[in-house]
């Protein structure tokens, strides 16, 4: 399978065009066709010579994804299941917010982080997505908007889908630079958030990139004992190492960090744990924010359930009394396969059942 041209940054496309005997402006024209006019075929690039179109077609495909499933929620959330060229499946989610249209992208096929409450890790990591496959997720949603012809655009991106983004660091950074490029989709850096489970060394590297992209950290527990029991990554990067990296990030960038905290009934949602969380984040309170997330139950992880509203409210109140900036996250798509990785997992089960039935 040819690589997707979406996998190149504009500078890389310019370098490639020059290597193939073209002027730099030719690459800029191609970039415009891809991201402003959003063509789906190189033949639609009418100001590019037929000879160079032939070279493009020999070298690249445009969009490597096929849509397998699209589930639309009553609130307008759309969960997509896309098929990659090798037949593997990934999820992408469109969330309609009051401030714009936000897309959550996947960065890996499967996940090795091993969070015990998460559907994404039910299937171990099989491979990284390349930058073209990550960018193509945004383009698939934008193409959906274009067909609706209602002047909608992807305005916000969260890198919070299946996989650990910082375990696929270079492809994610290429993706970020591509969607942020002013000559293309021009999605503002401050409208993009990358979430990590806590790879401390990569948080430090990200701090040195000089990008204005937001950072979120999946925390989910306020002490090492509990965090290690529900998030295996904490055994490699315990809270002291993680918070040292976070403090370095804040000192280097002067940017706020968001902590994601999923509310698991009678696991991590007690008032004592709320106080521990307030104490843990005290030193960086001015440049941190806590996002309390209602849990979407996963059948394979039935030891966990959603915290009742009363427990969430009590937890929230403790944080607020301690001066912690926090919010309870708005839910999206609760009437579809809402948990991250759930649609993919359920579809793969159905595919296996169909295959087994066909053999009998």
From Swiss-Prot:
Annotated catalysed reactions: adenosine(2503) in 23S rRNA + 2 reduced [2Fe-2S]-[ferredoxin] + 2 S-adenosyl-L-methionine = 2-methyladenosine(2503) in 23S rRNA + 5'-deoxyadenosine + L-methionine + 2 oxidized [2Fe-2S]-[ferredoxin] + S-adenosyl-L-homocysteine; adenosine(37) in tRNA + 2 reduced [2Fe-2S]-[ferredoxin] + 2 S-adenosyl-L-methionine = 2-methyladenosine(37) in tRNA + 5'-deoxyadenosine + L-methionine + 2 oxidized [2Fe-2S]-[ferredoxin] + S-adenosyl-L-homocysteine
Assigned EC number: 2.1.1.192
Disulfide bonds: 104-340
GO biological process: rRNA base methylation; tRNA methylation
GO molecular function list: 4 iron, 4 sulfur cluster binding; metal ion binding; rRNA (adenine(2503)-C2-)-methyltransferase activity; rRNA binding; tRNA (adenine(37)-C2)-methyltransferase activity; tRNA binding
Organism: Streptococcus equi subsp. equi (strain 4047)
Family from the record: Belongs to the radical SAM superfamily. RlmN family.
Gene of this entry: rlmN
Needed cofactors: [4Fe-4S] cluster
Free-text function comment from the UniProt entry: Specifically methylates position 2 of adenine 2503 in 23S rRNA and position 2 of adenine 37 in tRNAs.
Other facts noted in the record for this chain: Reaction proceeds by a ping-pong mechanism involving intermediate methylation of a conserved cysteine residue.
Record-linked Pfam families: Radical_SAM (PF04055), RlmN_N (PF21016)
Name recorded for this polypeptide: Probable dual-specificity RNA methyltransferase RlmN
Keywords carried by this UniProt record: 4Fe-4S, Cytoplasm, Disulfide bond, Iron, Iron-sulfur, Metal-binding, Methyltransferase, rRNA processing, S-adenosyl-L-methionine, Transferase, tRNA processing
Primary location group: cytoplasm
Gene Ontology cellular-component terms listed: cytoplasm
Residues annotated as binding [4Fe-4S] cluster: 111, 115, 118
């Amino acid at each position: 399978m040819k690589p997707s041209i979406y996998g190149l940054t504009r500078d890389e496309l310019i370098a490639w065009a020059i290597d193939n005997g073209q002027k730099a402006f030719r690459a800029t024209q191609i970039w415009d066709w891809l991201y402003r006019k959003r063509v789906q075929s190189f033949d639609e690039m009418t100001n590019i010579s037929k000879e160079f179109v032939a070279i493009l077609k020999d070298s690249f495909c445009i969009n490597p994804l096929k849509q397998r499933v699209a589930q639309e929620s009553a609130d307008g959330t759309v969960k997509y299941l896309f098929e990659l060229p090798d037949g593997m499946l990934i999820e992408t989610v469109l969330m309609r917010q009051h401030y714009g249209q936000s897309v959550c992208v996947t960065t890996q096929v499967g996940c090795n982080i091993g969070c015990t409450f998460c559907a994404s890790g039910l299937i171990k990591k099989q491979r990284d997505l390349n930058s073209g496959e990550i960018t193509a997720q945004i383009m698939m949603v934008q193409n959906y908007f274009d067909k609706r012809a209602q002047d909608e655009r992807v305005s916000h991106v969260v890198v919070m889908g299946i996989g650990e983004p910082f375990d696929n660091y270079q492809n994610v950074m290429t993706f970020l630079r591509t969607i942020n490029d002013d000559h293309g989709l021009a999605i503002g850096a401050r409208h993009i958030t990358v979430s990590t489970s806590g790879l401390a060394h990569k948080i430090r590297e990200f701090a040195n990139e000089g990008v204005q992209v937001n950072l979120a950290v999946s925390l989910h527990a306020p002490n090492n004992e509990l965090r290690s029991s529900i998030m295996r990554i904490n055994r490699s990067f315990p809270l002291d190492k993680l918070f040292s990296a976070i403090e370095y990030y804040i000192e280097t960038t002067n940017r706020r960090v968001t902590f994601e905290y999923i509310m698991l009934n009678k696991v991590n949602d007690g008032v004592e744990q709320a106080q521990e969380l307030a104490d843990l984040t005290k030193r960086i309170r001015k440049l941190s924010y806590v996002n309390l997330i209602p849990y979407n139950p996963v059948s394979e992880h039935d030891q966990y359930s959603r915290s009742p509203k009363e427990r969430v409210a009590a937890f929230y109140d403790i944080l607020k009394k301690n001066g912690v900036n926090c919010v309870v996250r708005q839910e999206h798509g609760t009437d579809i396969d809402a948990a991250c990785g759930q649609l993919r997992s359920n579809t793969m089960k159905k595919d296996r059942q169909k295959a087994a039935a066909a053999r009998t």
